[in-house]
Curated annotation (Swiss-Prot):
Example of a GO cellular component annotation carried by this entry: nucleus
Function: May play a role in the regulation of the epithelial-mesenchymal transition.
Domain of life: Eukaryota
Classification via Pfam families: FAM195
Protein name in the entry: Mapk-regulated corepressor-interacting protein 1
Residue window of motif PXDLS motif: 80-84
Residue ranges with Polar residues bias: 1-26
Lineage, highest ranks first: Eukaryota, Metazoa, Chordata, Craniata, Vertebrata
Protein keywords: Cytoplasm, Nucleus
Region Disordered, residue ranges: 1-27, 54-97
Amino acid sequence: MTSSSTPRMHTYKRTSSPRSPTNTGELFTPAHEENVRFIHDTWLCVLRDIKCPQNHERNDRGPQEYVEKNPNPNLHSFIPVDLSDLKKRNTQDSKKS
């Protein structure tokens, strides 16, 4: 690894380091893609197991859905963001400009 590719440290604070050019698009390594695929597949299994709890009747070690006992009133109007949809919109907006 060359010194230009490593982040520089100064009194325990990260300073600017060389960044990848932003105009090249997103490039992912095979390891990154494998990790994303693993997380995605595992999450689908968890969702399936939550919807079909009979698979875990004999075993209490299955996934458990967490529900707040006292929901925060400030989050009552919270609407989750679909990150893939947001990325698509941002990509389309950047192509228009």
